[in-house]
Amino acid sequence: MKQPSVNIKNKRATFDYELMDTYTAGIVLTGTEIKSIRLGKASLVDTFCYFAKGELWVKNMHIAEYFYGSYNNHTARRDRKLLLNKKELEKIQRGMKDPGFTTVPVRLFINEKGLAKLVVALAKGKKQYDKRESIKEKDDRRDMARMFKR
């Protein structure tokens, strides 16, 4: 039986940051958390990553409580550990030491094996004029698409 595809995106990440390198990481979850994600009840708004004791953690990721979960339901916003190779962790940590760089979650999905994966990106914050420029480019692309439709 094929599971419905779950693809939850952090739309603010591409607007607020210039994404450099992306990495696909596993997430340490409880049973009710993965069930909620499979139902699409998760959000990456205001989510960020940080290092603690050489491990990468995601903070402020909202996974709604599972409706059918009883007393052993999870906390909606808790810190979750990300699973990456040692080399990838070292690359991300080196990149975050540069001024202006951070690590942001971009996309949450379920792979073909049924495991939840989080795509994190090493990113540099955009300035206000860069954001205006990207809005203008999007508007220009929309206008061109409208003109070609006619």
UniProtKB/Swiss-Prot annotation:
Subcellular location(s) per record: Cytoplasm
Keyword RNA-binding: yes
Any Pfam family hit: SmpB
Keywords recorded for this protein, A-Z: Cytoplasm, RNA-binding
Span of the signal peptide: none
Gene3D superfamilies (UniProt xref): 2.40.280.10
Hydrolase among keywords: no
Protein purpose: Required for rescue of stalled ribosomes mediated by trans-translation. Binds to transfer-messenger RNA (tmRNA), required for stable association of tmRNA with ribosomes. tmRNA and SmpB together mimic tRNA shape, replacing the anticodon stem-loop with SmpB. tmRNA is encoded by the ssrA gene; the 2 termini fold to resemble tRNA(Ala) and it encodes a 'tag peptide', a short internal open reading frame. During trans-translation Ala-aminoacylated tmRNA acts like a tRNA, entering the A-site of stalled ribosomes, displacing the stalled mRNA.
PROSITE patterns: SSRP
Family recorded in the similarity comment: Belongs to the SmpB family.
GO CC annotations, alphabetized: cytosol
The organism's place on the tree of life at top rank: Bacteria
Name this protein carries in UniProt: SsrA-binding protein
GO molecular function, one term: RNA binding
First-listed, main subcellular location of the protein, grouped into a coarse class: cytoplasm
GO biological process: trans-translation
